[in-house]
Amino acid sequence: MKGVVIFGIHHWGFSVRVPRTSAGGSSYIVPPITTILGALSRGYCSDYAVKNNVSCTKEFIDKFSSDLFWVTYGTEEHMLMPYSDLLREERVPYRQSKNRSLDHVSDWFGVSAFGKVYCENVNFSILLLLNKENSEFWSKLGWQIISLGTKESLVTITDVKVVDVEESSDEDIYTIYYIPAECLTNTEEFEVVNMPVKSVYELSSKPSIGVFSNFLVPRKTPFIGGKVKVKKSNVRGDICKVYKMADKYVITFKEGLEKWYSK
Protein backbone atom coordinates (compact mmCIF):
# COMPACT_ATOMS: atom_id res chain seq x y z
CA MET A 1 0.00 0.00 0.00
CA LYS A 2 1.14 3.55 -0.74
CA GLY A 3 0.45 6.64 1.32
CA VAL A 4 0.65 10.39 0.91
CA VAL A 5 1.79 12.65 3.76
CA ILE A 6 0.73 16.29 3.40
CA PHE A 7 2.67 18.74 5.59
CA GLY A 8 1.43 22.24 6.33
CA ILE A 9 1.28 25.19 8.71
CA HIS A 10 -1.82 26.85 10.15
CA HIS A 11 -1.77 30.64 9.70
CA TRP A 12 -3.82 31.52 12.82
CA GLY A 13 -5.89 28.42 13.43
CA PHE A 14 -9.18 27.13 12.09
CA SER A 15 -12.92 26.96 12.58
CA VAL A 16 -15.01 23.91 11.69
CA ARG A 17 -18.49 24.52 12.99
CA VAL A 18 -20.29 21.80 14.91
CA PRO A 19 -23.83 21.20 13.60
CA ARG A 20 -26.83 20.93 15.90
CA THR A 21 -25.53 23.73 18.13
CA SER A 22 -26.91 27.20 18.76
CA ALA A 23 -26.41 30.13 16.41
CA GLY A 24 -23.17 30.82 18.22
CA GLY A 25 -21.85 27.34 17.65
CA SER A 26 -18.50 25.85 18.55
CA SER A 27 -15.65 24.40 16.52
CA TYR A 28 -14.36 20.85 16.33
CA ILE A 29 -11.00 20.67 18.07
CA VAL A 30 -9.44 19.06 14.98
CA PRO A 31 -10.53 19.05 11.31
CA PRO A 32 -12.70 15.92 10.86
CA ILE A 33 -12.51 13.51 7.91
CA THR A 34 -15.25 15.40 6.05
CA THR A 35 -13.31 18.66 6.29
CA ILE A 36 -10.15 17.02 4.94
CA LEU A 37 -12.06 15.49 2.02
CA GLY A 38 -13.61 18.87 1.30
CA ALA A 39 -10.18 20.53 1.32
CA LEU A 40 -8.82 17.88 -1.06
CA SER A 41 -11.74 18.42 -3.43
CA ARG A 42 -10.75 22.05 -4.05
CA GLY A 43 -8.38 21.25 -6.92
CA TYR A 44 -10.93 19.00 -8.58
CA CYS A 45 -13.75 21.51 -8.10
CA SER A 46 -11.94 24.72 -9.08
CA ASP A 47 -13.83 25.06 -12.39
CA TYR A 48 -17.06 23.46 -11.23
CA ALA A 49 -20.49 25.03 -10.98
CA VAL A 50 -23.23 23.65 -8.71
CA LYS A 51 -25.38 21.23 -10.69
CA ASN A 52 -28.92 20.36 -9.66
CA ASN A 53 -28.34 21.83 -6.18
CA VAL A 54 -25.61 19.27 -5.47
CA SER A 55 -22.15 20.29 -4.26
CA CYS A 56 -19.09 19.38 -6.33
CA THR A 57 -17.61 17.81 -3.20
CA LYS A 58 -20.28 15.10 -3.43
CA GLU A 59 -19.24 14.28 -6.99
CA PHE A 60 -15.60 14.22 -5.92
CA ILE A 61 -16.27 11.86 -2.99
CA ASP A 62 -18.58 9.60 -5.01
CA LYS A 63 -15.92 9.31 -7.71
CA PHE A 64 -12.72 9.04 -5.68
CA SER A 65 -13.49 7.92 -2.10
CA SER A 66 -12.82 4.30 -3.08
CA ASP A 67 -9.20 5.34 -3.78
CA LEU A 68 -8.71 6.16 -0.10
CA PHE A 69 -8.26 3.53 2.60
CA TRP A 70 -7.97 6.05 5.45
CA VAL A 71 -7.61 9.78 6.17
CA THR A 72 -6.46 11.45 9.39
CA TYR A 73 -4.87 14.61 10.81
CA GLY A 74 -2.43 15.46 13.58
CA THR A 75 -0.01 18.06 14.95
CA GLU A 76 3.46 17.52 16.42
CA GLU A 77 2.99 20.27 19.02
CA HIS A 78 0.27 20.14 21.69
CA MET A 79 -0.61 23.80 21.13
CA LEU A 80 -4.18 23.80 19.79
CA MET A 81 -6.45 25.91 22.00
CA PRO A 82 -10.24 26.04 21.47
CA TYR A 83 -11.96 29.33 22.24
CA SER A 84 -14.96 31.47 21.30
CA ASP A 85 -15.10 35.07 20.14
CA LEU A 86 -18.03 36.96 21.61
CA LEU A 87 -19.34 39.59 19.22
CA ARG A 88 -22.24 41.98 19.53
CA GLU A 89 -23.66 41.96 16.03
CA GLU A 90 -26.52 43.53 14.14
CA ARG A 91 -29.71 41.49 14.10
CA VAL A 92 -31.99 43.93 12.29
CA PRO A 93 -32.42 41.74 9.16
CA TYR A 94 -33.85 38.98 11.36
CA ARG A 95 -36.37 41.19 13.16
CA GLN A 96 -40.02 41.55 12.27
CA SER A 97 -40.75 44.83 10.50
CA LYS A 98 -42.68 46.13 13.51
CA ASN A 99 -39.50 45.83 15.63
CA ARG A 100 -37.21 47.70 13.21
CA SER A 101 -38.19 51.19 14.30
CA LEU A 102 -35.95 53.41 16.44
CA ASP A 103 -38.21 52.69 19.39
CA HIS A 104 -36.77 49.16 19.43
CA VAL A 105 -33.11 50.05 18.81
CA SER A 106 -32.03 48.14 21.93
CA ASP A 107 -33.25 44.94 20.26
CA TRP A 108 -31.28 45.48 17.07
CA PHE A 109 -28.15 43.81 18.37
CA GLY A 110 -27.31 40.48 19.95
CA VAL A 111 -24.31 38.58 21.25
CA SER A 112 -22.93 35.65 19.23
CA ALA A 113 -20.08 33.26 19.93
CA PHE A 114 -17.96 31.98 17.06
CA GLY A 115 -16.03 28.82 17.89
CA LYS A 116 -12.40 28.65 16.77
CA VAL A 117 -9.22 26.74 17.51
CA TYR A 118 -6.15 28.95 17.93
CA CYS A 119 -2.91 27.38 16.65
CA GLU A 120 -0.82 30.09 15.00
CA ASN A 121 2.18 28.73 13.06
CA VAL A 122 1.50 25.18 14.27
CA ASN A 123 2.75 22.43 11.94
CA PHE A 124 0.28 19.73 10.97
CA SER A 125 0.23 16.71 8.71
CA ILE A 126 -2.53 14.83 6.93
CA LEU A 127 -2.14 11.13 6.17
CA LEU A 128 -3.79 9.54 3.16
CA LEU A 129 -3.61 5.75 2.93
CA LEU A 130 -4.35 4.71 -0.64
CA ASN A 131 -6.14 1.67 -2.02
CA LYS A 132 -4.87 2.37 -5.53
CA GLU A 133 -1.50 3.26 -7.04
CA ASN A 134 -2.46 6.84 -7.91
CA SER A 135 -0.32 8.78 -5.47
CA GLU A 136 0.52 11.45 -8.07
CA PHE A 137 -3.15 12.46 -8.32
CA TRP A 138 -3.56 12.78 -4.54
CA SER A 139 -0.23 14.58 -4.19
CA LYS A 140 -1.43 17.23 -6.64
CA LEU A 141 -4.65 17.68 -4.67
CA GLY A 142 -2.64 17.96 -1.46
CA TRP A 143 -0.59 20.84 -2.85
CA GLN A 144 -3.81 22.70 -3.71
CA ILE A 145 -5.21 22.79 -0.17
CA ILE A 146 -5.50 26.41 1.00
CA SER A 147 -7.74 26.07 4.06
CA LEU A 148 -9.00 23.54 6.60
CA GLY A 149 -12.44 24.59 7.78
CA THR A 150 -13.94 27.97 6.95
CA LYS A 151 -12.42 29.91 4.06
CA GLU A 152 -10.61 32.07 6.64
CA SER A 153 -8.92 28.98 8.13
CA LEU A 154 -5.89 29.44 5.90
CA VAL A 155 -2.99 27.01 5.73
CA THR A 156 0.26 26.81 3.77
CA ILE A 157 1.24 23.40 2.41
CA THR A 158 5.00 23.02 2.83
CA ASP A 159 5.64 19.52 1.49
CA VAL A 160 3.91 16.43 0.11
CA LYS A 161 5.61 13.03 0.24
CA VAL A 162 4.70 9.63 -1.15
CA VAL A 163 5.68 6.83 1.25
CA ASP A 164 5.24 3.09 1.66
CA VAL A 165 2.59 1.86 4.09
CA GLU A 166 3.09 -1.36 6.03
CA GLU A 167 1.41 -3.09 8.94
CA SER A 168 3.27 -2.56 12.20
CA SER A 169 3.90 -5.09 14.96
CA ASP A 170 5.87 -2.69 17.19
CA GLU A 171 5.10 -2.93 20.88
CA ASP A 172 5.28 0.84 21.47
CA ILE A 173 3.41 3.13 19.09
CA TYR A 174 3.79 6.90 19.09
CA THR A 175 1.09 8.73 17.20
CA ILE A 176 -0.17 12.29 16.73
CA TYR A 177 -3.26 11.33 14.72
CA TYR A 178 -6.85 10.89 15.81
CA ILE A 179 -8.06 7.31 16.11
CA PRO A 180 -11.50 5.62 15.95
CA ALA A 181 -12.66 5.35 19.56
CA GLU A 182 -13.44 1.64 19.23
CA CYS A 183 -9.79 0.83 18.45
CA LEU A 184 -8.36 1.36 21.96
CA THR A 185 -9.27 -0.19 25.30
CA ASN A 186 -7.54 2.55 27.36
CA THR A 187 -8.19 6.13 26.29
CA GLU A 188 -5.94 8.07 28.67
CA GLU A 189 -4.35 11.18 27.09
CA PHE A 190 -7.14 11.26 24.52
CA GLU A 191 -10.39 13.17 24.30
CA VAL A 192 -13.43 11.49 22.78
CA VAL A 193 -14.94 13.67 20.05
CA ASN A 194 -18.01 12.86 17.98
CA MET A 195 -17.15 14.01 14.45
CA PRO A 196 -18.67 13.71 10.97
CA VAL A 197 -17.33 11.01 8.66
CA LYS A 198 -19.87 11.46 5.89
CA SER A 199 -21.63 14.72 5.11
CA VAL A 200 -24.71 15.72 3.14
CA TYR A 201 -23.83 17.80 0.10
CA GLU A 202 -27.25 18.44 -1.41
CA LEU A 203 -28.85 21.85 -0.96
CA SER A 204 -32.22 21.24 0.68
CA SER A 205 -34.78 22.93 2.90
CA LYS A 206 -34.87 19.78 5.05
CA PRO A 207 -32.06 19.56 7.64
CA SER A 208 -29.72 16.59 7.48
CA ILE A 209 -26.52 16.15 9.45
CA GLY A 210 -24.81 13.16 7.83
CA VAL A 211 -23.02 10.28 9.57
CA PHE A 212 -21.01 10.67 12.80
CA SER A 213 -18.54 8.51 14.71
CA ASN A 214 -16.46 8.86 17.89
CA PHE A 215 -12.73 9.53 17.61
CA LEU A 216 -9.88 9.77 20.10
CA VAL A 217 -7.96 13.05 19.76
CA PRO A 218 -4.56 13.42 21.50
CA ARG A 219 -4.93 15.97 24.29
CA LYS A 220 -2.77 17.20 27.15
CA THR A 221 -5.14 19.47 29.06
CA PRO A 222 -5.84 22.22 28.25
CA PHE A 223 -4.05 21.92 24.92
CA ILE A 224 -4.83 19.61 22.00
CA GLY A 225 -2.39 17.73 19.80
CA GLY A 226 1.08 16.33 20.27
CA LYS A 227 2.47 12.80 20.39
CA VAL A 228 0.85 10.07 22.48
CA LYS A 229 2.30 6.67 23.36
CA VAL A 230 0.05 3.67 22.72
CA LYS A 231 0.93 0.12 23.76
CA LYS A 232 0.21 -2.60 21.21
CA SER A 233 -1.75 -4.44 23.92
CA ASN A 234 -4.08 -1.42 24.08
CA VAL A 235 -5.13 -1.83 20.43
CA ARG A 236 -8.17 -3.99 19.70
CA GLY A 237 -6.62 -6.28 17.11
CA ASP A 238 -9.96 -7.94 16.35
CA ILE A 239 -11.32 -4.83 14.63
CA CYS A 240 -8.35 -2.49 14.10
CA LYS A 241 -4.83 -2.43 12.65
CA VAL A 242 -1.70 -0.35 13.15
CA TYR A 243 0.05 0.99 10.06
CA LYS A 244 3.43 2.66 9.71
CA MET A 245 4.20 5.33 7.10
CA ALA A 246 7.92 6.19 7.32
CA ASP A 247 8.22 7.32 10.97
CA LYS A 248 4.48 7.89 11.47
CA TYR A 249 1.94 5.50 12.98
CA VAL A 250 -1.78 5.42 12.32
CA ILE A 251 -4.43 3.22 13.94
CA THR A 252 -7.67 2.55 12.13
CA PHE A 253 -10.40 0.03 11.39
CA LYS A 254 -9.44 -3.04 9.38
CA GLU A 255 -11.89 -1.94 6.68
CA GLY A 256 -10.81 1.72 6.79
CA LEU A 257 -13.19 4.26 5.25
CA GLU A 258 -15.18 1.40 3.73
CA LYS A 259 -16.92 1.24 7.11
CA TRP A 260 -18.92 4.26 5.91
CA TYR A 261 -18.14 4.59 2.21
CA SER A 262 -19.03 1.60 0.06
CA LYS A 263 -16.78 0.88 -2.91
Curated annotation (Swiss-Prot):
Disulfide bonds, paired cysteine numbers: none
UniProt keyword NAD, yes or no: no
Biological-process GO terms, alphabetical: defense response to virus
Key words of the record: Antiviral defense
UniProt KW Transport keyword: no
Role description: CRISPR (clustered regularly interspaced short palindromic repeat) is an adaptive immune system that provides protection against mobile genetic elements (viruses, transposable elements and conjugative plasmids). CRISPR clusters contain spacers, sequences complementary to antecedent mobile elements, and target invading nucleic acids. CRISPR clusters are transcribed and processed into CRISPR RNA (crRNA).
Complex and partners: Part of the aCascade ribonucleoprotein complex, minimally composed of Csa2 and Cas5a, which binds crRNA. Other possible components of aCascade in strain P1 are Cas6b (SSO1437) and Csa5 (SSO1443), while SSO1399, Cas5b (SSO1400) and SSO1401 have sometimes been seen weakly associated. Csa2 is probably the major RNA-binding subunit. The Csa2-Cas5a-crRNA complex also binds target DNA homologous to crRNA, probably forming an R-loop. Purified aCascade forms a filament about 6 nm in width.
Entry similarity comment: Belongs to the CRISPR-associated protein Cas5 family. Subtype I-A/Apern subfamily.
Note: The aCascade complex was purified from strain P1.
Protein name per its UniProtKB record: CRISPR-associated protein Cas5 2
Organism: Saccharolobus solfataricus (strain ATCC 35092 / DSM 1617 / JCM 11322 / P2)
Upper taxonomic lineage: Archaea, Thermoproteota, Thermoprotei, Sulfolobales, Sulfolobaceae
Gene: cas5b
